[in-house]
C-alpha cells in the first residue's frame, strides 16, 4: 500500500472518491490537510456542452477527529461550474459513497450539503 493510500484510511470513509489531497502540513499543534474536489460532472451535465469548470469555491475548514493527540483540520473546496447558456455558477451537493455508519460532525455535513 502506498503512503498516500494509507493516509486516506484515517479520514472519513469515501472521502478519497470525491477529493484529491493537494497539501499536507504537520505542525506541533495540528495536522492540516487541503483537499480539492475531483473534477467530475454529473451524468446529465457531462452531455451538456454549456457546462464548463469555473475554478473552486473558497476553502472551508472543518475540524475532523483528532489523530495522535493533535486536532486535524480539513481545508476543503468544491468545484464551481458555469452554465454558459443560463450564466449560472453552481457547485454540486456532495454525498459520501458510504454514508451509513460514517460519523461526521455537523460542520462536515453542512459543507457537503452546501451548494455554494
Language-model regions, residue ranges each:
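Short, positively charged, Gly/Tyr-enriched micro-motifs
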Residues: 61-116
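Amphipathic, alpha-helical segments enriched in basic
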Residues: 8-10, 20, 51, 58, ...
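N-terminal juxtadomain amphipathic helix
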Residues: 34-82
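Broad hydrophobic/π-residue packing in well-ordered secondary structure
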Residues: 11-13, 45, 83-86
